[in-house]
A protein has these predicted regions:
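Mature extracellular or lumenal effector domains of secreted proteins
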Residues: 1-262
Length: 262
């Protein structure tokens, strides 16, 4: 190997060099023909350390942009001492260039993707329609997006066994779940990633953590919905349907929580 590493006098590239491992190793091992034996030993030790670090990064990616982990559970397994925080992940494992940023809960190993944006503008719908999907209204539409493309999201779903997310409905004189009569005639619906409609009833239903909107106050209040599923393909939420609107004093905003996969 020392003989191969000390060669360097040829002019122009050798057509076979791209397939020669010794040439590729030059990234780690510097030219040594002018070094003393002691300097060669030191250079070799440093080069082997760089090579070892590089191999470790391939075997156990550390969540940096150059070495994204498959997901946060893999990062937790390989680097259990890392704190919770933002890390780079590459669920499809194809190329670090399409890696995405995720929040890793290092206590649970959950991988959380952030919405983009997290809060809608204030929306008032002046229409005689009985229901409306917020992403499809003629004016003031709000598109729910996330900081991950569909390909990475799908691979993340495939590698997970459960997912959860919260949606907070900020309301002004607008019902979100129960109304004053204590029925759910105007309850919102949520559109899942896989086009399943998640409602207050049925097999695919949401939880209601709090419901201030029932009182139809003219000041801002909020209702918090939570979706938990052992079918990760359902999340994240991509649209919200409202049913209580049509007056100028009614308004709402939608706050989209991060979606977490485990």
């Amino acid at each position: 190997m020392m003989g191969m590493m000390s060669q360097g006098g040829s002019k122009g590239p050798d057509p076979a060099s791209a397939d020669d491992p010794s040439v590729q190793m030059g990234r780690f091992f510097p030219p040594m023909e002018h070094l003393s034996p002691e300097e060669k030993t030191e250079a070799m030790e440093r080069a082997f350390e760089r090579l070892k670090t590089s191999m470790d990064m391939l075997a156990k990616p550390d969540g940096t942009q150059k070495a994204p982990a498959k997901n946060c559970q893999a990062l937790k397994t390989n680097h259990p001492s890392k704190p919770s925080g933002n890390y780079w992940i590459d669920p499809n494992g194809m190329d670090a260039k399409d890696a995405i940023m995720a929040y890793c809960d290092m206590q649970t190993g959950a991988t959380c993707i952030q919405p983009k944006p997290a809060m809608s503008h204030e929306i008032t719908i002046m229409s005689d329609d009985k229901e409306a999907w917020v992403g499809e209204i003629d004016t003031n539409a709000f598109d729910i997006n996330y900081k991950a493309d569909s390909n990475q999201m799908n691979f993340l779903q495939l590698a997970s066994s459960s997912a959860e997310q919260t949606i907070t409905f900020h309301c002004k004189d607008t019902v979100a779940h129960l109304n004053r009569a204590n029925n759910k005639r105007h309850a919102v619906s949520l559109m899942a990633w896989n086009d399943l409609e998640i409602k207050h009833r049925g097999k695919a239903r949401y939880q209601v953590l709090s419901d201030e909107c029932q009182h139809k106050k003219r000041s801002w209040a909020q209702t918090v919905f939570k979706v938990q599923s052992r079918k990760p393909a359902r999340l994240p939420i991509v649209d919200v349907q409202v049913q209580d609107f049509g007056r100028s004093n009614q308004a709402f905003k939608i706050e989209v929580g991060q979606v977490c996969f485990s």
